Amino acid sequence: MGLPPLLSLPSNSAPRSLGRVETPPEVVDFMVSLAEAPRGGRVLEPACAHGPFLRAFREAHGTAYRFVGVEIDPKALDLPPWAEGILADFLLWEPGEAFDLILGNPPYGIVGEASKYPIHVFKAVKDLYKKAFSTWKGKYNLYGAFLEKAVRLLKPGGVLVFVVPATWLVLEDFALLREFLAREGKTSVYYLGEVFPQKKVSAVVIRFQKSGKGLSLWDTQESESGFTPILWAEYPHWEGEIIRFETEETRKLEISGMPLGDLFHIRFAARSPEFKKHPAVRKEPGPGLVPVLTGRNLKPGWVDYEKNHSGLWMPKERAKELRDFYATPHLVVAHTKGTRVVAAWDERAYPWREEFHLLPKEGVRLDPSSLVQWLNSEAMQKHVRTLYRDFVPHLTLRMLERLPVRREYGFHTSPESARNF
């Protein structure tokens, strides 16, 4: 097996800096129950450490397999004698052979500067990763690269079983990964929720087979005996679209209204560095200055214009130099308040450092009060909770675009009408 030059890890590298999180035994057992390989087949655990998945698979399925573990950290590699341990960076490793089964818990986190991201020890090879993986996009999480690499190392018909954060189901950074999985074989997703102790991360198990097509979505029920899978829906023609827990009720609601993205241009606020560079921005209040607002100023149905949470002030009339829509009263929807909808109408047109800003498209006439009331309603919160559960810690652009709005909730369209704020 060919080994690339091994990244020199700092002697004090902590598991967190490598993206490693211990897998609860009940999760390991559930994943092993989904795993399969032909007798005599090759079974691989990436980022293996002491090989919990190899050990559990061998105990459940027997010894008639060739077991291989790959680990980048020499201090962590501790496999039993019946398994072959390889010290290598899995993402750059080229074994020259394919595998029947790959299972495990890949590291997760964004590779970047130590001041911002916990997985900073891989920063030296990040450019190599970006060149190696066709699914790398945006602030790609390391587990996405592990998924692509593992799929490429499978034999035809081979099986992959990983436990990963649920974020890949909906985030735009994983759009290429979802499309890649849809092209390469059959994907099954099992929702577990927050099963990692002391981690605010919602997890799913992905079972991928390098044959067939389509998506199966499963819920699970946990008991003393482990996780029981419950089939939610099957999508035989899945092409990599975002994955949601749709119900008859959510489908009816979406059919009955227009997507918010069809009615509004959705814009992003200027960021802190832009404000700090602007010559009119001050760090102390003064005559003619207003607070630069943040998500903490946005409440369900109203805006707190008085408190300053950003530590920045500026003349309101100059805010349009940062974003032109700051000059116009408009709809503001939270990006930073979890997977729920918090909306208000910014009638004073203040500068904002955060959140989504929605401007009506040509021909859309609005009743701001009714629209805001609908977006903050319990019916809307239930709709979002049902579809997206706790996949991500914030409302995303793609989620926002698809929120349904019926005409009785504050809008109508006509070719002749102009914008009415």
Swiss-Prot record:
Transmembrane segments: none annotated. GO terms for molecular function: DNA binding; site-specific DNA-methyltransferase (adenine-specific) activity. Keywords: DNA-binding, Methyltransferase, Restriction system, S-adenosyl-L-methionine, Transferase. The keyword Repressor does not apply. Changing Y108 to A/G: Drastically reduces enzymatic activity; KM for both DNA and s-adenosylmethionine is not significantly changed. The record marks N105, P106, Y108 as: Important for catalytic activity. It catalyses: a 2'-deoxyadenosine in DNA + S-adenosyl-L-methionine = an N(6)-methyl-2'-deoxyadenosine in DNA + S-adenosyl-L-homocysteine + H(+). Coiled coil: none annotated. Residues 1-18 have a biased composition (Low complexity). Residues 1-20 are annotated as: Disordered. S-adenosyl-L-methionine binds at T23, E45, P46, A47, C48, E71, D89, P107. GO terms for biological process: DNA restriction-modification system; methylation. It comes from the Bacteria. Its EC number is 2.1.1.72. It holds the Pfam family Eco57I. Belongs to the N(4)/N(6)-methyltransferase family. This is Type II methyltransferase M.TaqI. The gene is taqIM.
